[in-house]
Each structure stands twice: as structure tokens, then as C-alpha cells.
Design a protein with these regions (language model features):
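Short active-site oxyanion
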Residues: 25-31, 104-107, 155-156
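Short phosphate-binding loop-to-helix
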Residues: 58-73, 92
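Short glycine-cluster motifs
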Residues: 73-132
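Glycine-rich, flexible N-terminal cofactor/catalytic loop recognition
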Residues: 1-58
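Short beta-strand scaffold positions
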Residues: 33, 91, 159-160
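Conserved helicase motor
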Residues: 54-63, 135-139
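Beta-strand/loop-alpha-helix module characteristic of Rossmann-like adenine-cofactor folds
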Residues: 2-3, 114-162
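Short glycine-rich anion-binding loops that position phosphate/pyrophosphate groups of nucleotides
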Residues: 11-12, 83-87, 162
């Protein structure tokens, strides 16, 4: 039986990667990647060659899910990465992690970069109690979402795309 390892990748600075993440990328039999071009750039920077990289992103994760779970079962070590940060945090990956957990496959998540943590810590807002809302809707539902979090007493963290 294989194992799925969720590996956070650097956000902006390629030097912001842990030694353990590098080791997992080196040891991986297969890497599922949000964007194979971005992952290849990271692997080249780390001088890791010869890895099988398969696209797993928002546009194909539903179609690929069953095959991906089967691949995790068959491979010794399968790694999941996103373009930047931790997979499944406002990025693809949640469905694969959940499916592997439901199949009783081992899943590990390495600690590492998540954009909202340094933003929260550096904001000066209270960090002891907060909620994370992900991306706000662009148009439809945006006002409703704002109204639903307006009275929140905890610090509210959300992403805004440029």
C-alpha cells in the first residue's frame, strides 16, 4: 500500500522550503501537481530530476480522482503539491486527501507555507481566535458573504485575488 504526502511549496521565494519537503520530493515515486510547469521549475531549482509529474488541478480533479486514489494505492510514495503554499488550502487537493482517508490509505501533511498565516501574524490583529473563509466570491454572493461575516467577533481571514 502506498502513502499520500501533502507537501507545501514556497510562496514567492523558492528558498522557503523545508528540508523534509525536499526529501519527500526526492523520494517520491509520483508527484501530483496543480501546474506541472511550476512544479518542474521548483524541481529544477532543487536539482531533482527524473520525476513523474501528473497534472491534478481544479479542472480535472473530479475526473482524475478515482485513478489518482488507485495510483496512491499502488505507489510507494505519492506526493501532492500546489503551485504555492499548502495543497487543499484554497487550492486543489482536498478531494484527493478525503478520498484517500476514506480508503484508509495513509495520508501525511508536512508543515510549511500557507499564505494566510504570515499575513495574519503580521497584521497586528488578534491571532488567538480566527476563522479562515478562503476566497470571497467575485460577484454573485459577495454581498451575502460580507453580511454573513460582518458580525463575527473573531479575526476573519480571507483571500482576495488580484
Amino acid at each position: 500500500m502506498g502513502e499520500l504526502i501533502v507537501v507545501p511549496t514556497p510562496i514567492g521565494n523558492l528558498e522557503d522550503i523545508t528540508l523534509r519537503a525536499i526529501r519527500m520530493l526526492k523520494e517520491a515515486d509520483l508527484i501530483y501537481s496543480e501546474d506541472t510547469r511550476v512544479t518542474k521549475r521548483l524541481l529544477n531549482h532543487l536539482e531533482i530530476a527524473g520525476k513523474q509529474i501528473v497534472a491534478f488541478h481544479a479542472h480535472n480533479e473530479h475526473k482524475q480522482l478515482e485513478r489518482c486514489v488507485q495510483t496512491v494505492k499502488e505507489n510507494t510514495l505519492t506526493v501532492l503539491v500546489s503551485d504555492a503554499g499548502t495543497p487543499a488550502i484554497s487550492d486543489p487537493g482536498f478531494l484527493l486527501v478525503r478520498a484517500c482517508v476514506e480508503e484508509n490509505l495513509p495520508v501525511s501533511c508536512l508543515p510549511g507555507p500557507t499564505a494566510f498565516v504570515p499575513a495574519l501574524v503580521g497584521s497586528g490583529f488578534p491571532c488567538d481566535r480566527f476563522i479562515y473563509e478562503g476566497f470571497l466570491p467575485h460577484k454573485k454572493g459577495r454581498q451575502t458573504k460580507w453580511l454573513s461575516i460582518k458580525e463575527e467577533e473573531r479575526t476573519v481571514v480571507f483571500y482576495e485575488s488580484p
